[in-house]
Regions:
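C-terminal catalytic histidine-bearing segment of alpha/beta-hydrolase fold enzymes
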Residues: 40, 216-268, 282
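Short beta-strand element of the alpha/beta-hydrolase
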Residues: 48-57
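Catalytic nucleophile-loop/oxyanion-hole region of alpha/beta-hydrolase
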Residues: 64-73, 84-120, 244-252
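Short beta-strand/loop motif that positions the catalytic acidic residue
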Residues: 195, 200-203, 207
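Conserved alpha/beta-hydrolase "acid-adjacent" motif
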Residues: 208-214
Length: 302
């Protein structure tokens, strides 16, 4: 890998108090009590301005940071894409911890766009297994300024429905006695809107840990809402293969991902956003779902 920069940022994420994340001394690399970002930038001559924030899996109890995180850097950097790997905190009874870490990561990457030569309107999120649940949660729940522009999901946990979720992830995030309302809130196939970003979703048909029905239902919800999405289910491979050589369909998967990443246009980095100032019609008074369908809301997404 022609890696020009590898920057290790350690974050104090007091997200809900509005505190600014700052660099800290390096903790133990296996410490998941303190979140961190590791940034891999492509060579300047290859850089496209695109970036991906990676959320490794681990059932919300540990993190597979290598084959679902750092080991992806050569692939993305070769495509001219920056890779930012997030080591997020485990919930340990507080589901807001990993979610706030991922939201803060999106904010930091966008705020650092000029420094890292990124397009702030071309920042995606990637997640594997439970990290896929975290990534799809940010894609479906986050405020517009924190929402990714696209999502890449490998064998993701999508639902919290006990009939087909990954129970380890469910219990670590929500607890064994989670209410039906809470399970619905974090069943991301039920939270898709027209504003949810486009998605690339991959499973193996013989995945016994996370049933592919998680991704099928998410794809159907995206499709119903007019969100571009692709779903690939390979005949075998089980669960947790990441970018390991042992995955039989690795080459096909990478070719599909490369083609997908090249398939959609990106707003220019210097594109101007236009705001409307006007009467109640312009603002969207009496328009159902005005946060989504009013003129200012529509223009903000252009």
């Amino acid at each position: 890998m022609k890696q020009k920069f590898s920057i290790l940022l350690f974050l104090l994420l007091l997200w809900f108090t509005g505190s600014q994340a700052v660099a800290q001394n390096a903790p133990n690399p296996f410490d998941i009590e303190q979140p961190s970002l590791r940034v891999f930038l492509p060579a300047p001559e290859l850089a496209t301005g695109r970036a991906v924030v990676a959320c490794p899996g681990g059932g919300y109890s540990h993190l597979a940071v290598d084959h679902e995180g750092y080991d992806w850097a050569p692939y993305f950097n070769k495509q001219g894409i920056a890779l930012i790997v997030l080591k997020y905190r485990m919930p340990n009874g507080d589901r807001t911890l990993p979610i706030s870490d991922a939201e803060a990561a999106m904010k930091i990457v966008r705020d650092s766009a000029d420094v890292w030569n990124l397009n702030p309107r071309d920042i995606g999120i990637m997640g594997s297994s439970a990290g896929g649940h975290l990534a799809s949660t940010i894609a479906t729940h986050a405020k517009p300024e924190l929402r990714p522009d696209f999502q890449i999901l490998f064998y993701p946990v999508i639902t919290m429905d006990k009939s087909y979720t990954h129970m380890g992830s469910h219990n670590s995030l929500l607890g064994k006695d989670a209410s039906a309302e809470l399970e619905k809130e974090y069943s991301n196939e039920k939270q898709v809107t027209k504003e949810t970003p486009r998605a690339f979703i991959v499973y193996s048909d013989d995945d016994k840990a996370v049933p592919p029905a998680n991704g099928v239902n998410y794809y159907l919800a995206l499709n119903k809402n007019g969100v571009p999405a692709v779903l690939h289910i390979y005949p075998s491979g089980g669960h947790g293969w990441g970018i390991r050589e042992g995955f039989l369909y690795k080459d096909e998967m990478l070719n599909e991902l490369t083609s997908w990443l090249r398939s959609f246009k990106v707003p220019r980095k210097d594109a101007v956003r236009v705001a409307c100032i006007g009467n109640s019609i312009t603002y969207g008074a009496r328009i159902k779902n005005r946060d989504r369908d009013s003129y200012p809301s529509v223009l903000s997404r252009m």
